[in-house]
Swiss-Prot record:
The gene is groEL. GO terms for biological process: protein refolding. PANTHER family: 60 KDA HEAT SHOCK PROTEIN, MITOCHONDRIAL. It is found in: Cytoplasm. This is Chaperonin GroEL. ATP binds at residues 30-33, 51, 87-91, 415, 479-481, 495. NCBIfam families: GroEL (TIGR02348), PRK00013.1 (NF000592), PRK12849.1 (NF009487), PRK12850.1 (NF009488), PRK12851.1 (NF009489). InterPro entries: Chaperonin_Cpn60_CS, Cpn60/GroEL, Cpn60/GroEL/TCP-1, GroEL-like_apical_dom_sf, GROEL-like_equatorial_sf, TCP-1-like_intermed_sf. It comes from Klebsiella pneumoniae (strain 342).
């Protein structure tokens, strides 16, 4: 086992604090409407330019191992805030730095670190309750656009696009961000349920100009099996032909004789048919077939539950207003499934989301909810260069997370004002002893830090602005973009409550651990390895030479 370097007490804390400050100073220059960019060097390709706090934090590694431990702990704050709310990473870092700096001063002055931490925790718990009380629900498009604009660094077009996307697909809908092809940002909305499977044969195409299959009011056959024998399907095909409607077959696979017969029937115009593979694999495929069945009011023909394809009737088939199938995707528009059944299915999947342990599973389940409950919107980000594209895409992603958080828990006044108001309301809060009272004051003082940093980045005097804001009440604050005071809600400067809450909770959690640190242990730097020089080896060789 490698030898360790151990530091105690003040020596350890000073080193750790230095690391905290290096990382936080790099991150906090990005805060606010007048925050600056940070350029990150990459081992290959062009450097990345960003104003995203967590992207900056992730890039920082310090040479001194003790300082690096401090930096990594603050990086954890930014990462946790990012995971919880998708935004507010810079705010969380600024809060953590303020609490650690003030807290370690108190420790150096002889306060008990454990009581300080208890005081900080007490203040944060009370602050979270106050934030909830200040929170206003965010439901209209204008507020959603404002939240998106602020989070995308005052880019109004991004805010409007996100509000429009949420308007189109609903709050449950999936909104994804992709690279665009032009200079302008675009919004693409897919109505209905879409999945990534195309037609099994190009001979099904009935719209040669678009290369797609479009079927109006079709029946939809759902089968959890491979279909290779056409005899199994004859009863269903005959019934559909009599009804004079088209048929869409969604099965594990359709192959051989069955596929050939369907193609011939389609080309002769006997019955319009199109076949696609079912989406997903294994258990996920079964679940997605069941989703489609719920949406279209059909039944999945599955041998697991004793159903046979030969015995299927028109009652077992789903229906939709329209189905569009192209080379890669199938879209089912306006399924005839009962609303109550769809809502029941959505509730069931939501329960699974709560119980899901992996992020991947959770994401796939959320996609299924969106496809059932809303739709899918794609924001295509336009930019002139790849470097700009990366930076803009990261901002749009942040804005998207912020608007989701706003819809979830509401909004509070932005620009650091909400935390200043919360701190003022908690001025009378006391702990069980004097050291806890100091801890409470440390946390309350730290709550001014985001406002001060926004002002500092705008080139103004933080203390003057902070005092002016504290002298006001309610949503009165400072708009750093226009350098004027007024009602932050009227200015359209809103922060999602969830983002502010998460930033404060994670900052206090990690900062509390750092304040109570008394000892730090790391590997000693490895000295130069002893040189097992060429001479020794060659000596042996010389001996061998003598033997020859």
């Amino acid at each position: 086992m490698a030898a360790k370097d151990v530091k105690f007490g003040n020596d350890a804390r000073v080193k750790m604090l230095r690391g905290v400050n290096v990382l936080a100073d790099a991150v906090k220059v990005t805060l606010g409407p007048k925050g600056r960019n940070v350029v990150l060097d990459k081992s290959f390709g062009a450097p990345t330019i960003t104003k995203d706090g967590v992207s900056v934090a992730r890039e920082i590694e310090l040479e001194d191992k003790f300082e690096n431990m401090g930096a990594q702990m603050v990086k954890e704050v930014a990462s946790k805030a990012n995971d919880a709310a998708g935004d507010g990473t810079t705010t969380a870092t600024v809060l953590a730095q303020a609490i650690v700096n003030e807290g370690l001063k108190a420790v150096a002055a002889g306060m008990n670190p454990m009581d300080l931490k208890r005081g900080i925790d007490k203040a944060v718990i009370a602050a979270v309750e106050e934030l909830k009380a200040l929170s206003v629900p965010c439901s209209d498009s204008k507020a959603i656009a404002q939240v998106g604009t602020i989070s995308a660094n005052s880019d109004e077009t991004v805010g409007k696009l996100i509000a429009e996307a949420m308007d189109k697909v609903g709050k449950e809908g999936v909104i994804t961000v992709e690279d665009g092809t032009g200079l302008e940002d675009e919004l693409d909305v897919v109505e209905g349920m879409q999945f990534d499977r195309g037609y099994l044969s190009p001979y099904f195409i009935n719209k040669p100009d678009t290369g797609a299959v479009e079927l109006e009011s079709p029946f939809i056959l759902l089968a959890d099996k491979k279909i290779s024998n056409i005899r199994e399907m004859l009863p269903v095909l005959e019934a559909v032909a009599k009804a004079g409607k088209p048929l869409v077959i969604i099965a594990e696979d359709v192959e051989g004789e069955a596929l050939a017969t369907l193609v011939v029937n389609t080309m002769r115009g006997i019955v319009k048919v199109a076949a696609v593979k079912a989406p997903g694999f294994g258990d996920r495929r079964k679940a997605m077939l069941q989703d489609i069945a719920t949406l279209t009011g059909g039944t999945v023909i599955s041998e697991e539950i004793g159903m046979e394809l030969e015995k299927a009737t028109l009652e077992d088939l789903g229906q939709a207003k329209r189905v569009v199938i192209n080379k890669d995707t199938t879209t089912i528009i306006d399924g005839v499934g009962e609303e109550s059944a769809i809502q029941g299915r959505v509730a069931q999947i939501r329960k699974q989301i709560e119980e899901a342990t992996s992020d991947y599973d959770r994401e796939k389940l959320q996609e299924r909810v969106a496809k059932l409950a809303g739709g899918v919107a794609v924001i295509k980000v336009g930019a002139a260069t790849e470097v700009e594209m990366k930076e803009k895409k990261a901002r749009v992603d942040d804005a998207l997370h912020a608007t989701r958080a706003a819809v979830e828990e509401g909004v509070v006044a932005g620009g650091g004002v909400a935390l200043v108001r919360v701190a003022a309301k908690l001025a009378g809060l006391t702990g069980q002893n004097e050291d806890q009272n100091v801890g409470i004051k440390v946390a309350l003082r730290a709550m001014e830090a985001p406002l001060r940093q926004i002002v500092s980045n705008a080139g103004e005097e933080p203390s003057v602005v902070a005092n002016n804001v504290k002298a006001g009440d309610g949503n009165y604050g400072y708009n750093a973009a226009t350098e004027e005071y007024g009602n932050m809600i009227d200015f359209g400067i809103l922060d999602p409550t969830k983002v502010t809450r998460s930033a404060l909770q994670y900052a206090a959690s990690v900062a509390g651990l750092m304040i109570t640190t008394e000892c730090m242990v790391t590997d000693l730097p490895k000295g130069d390895a002893p040189d097992l020089g060429a001479a020794g080896g060659m000596g042996g060789m010389g001996g061998m030479g003598g033997m020859m």
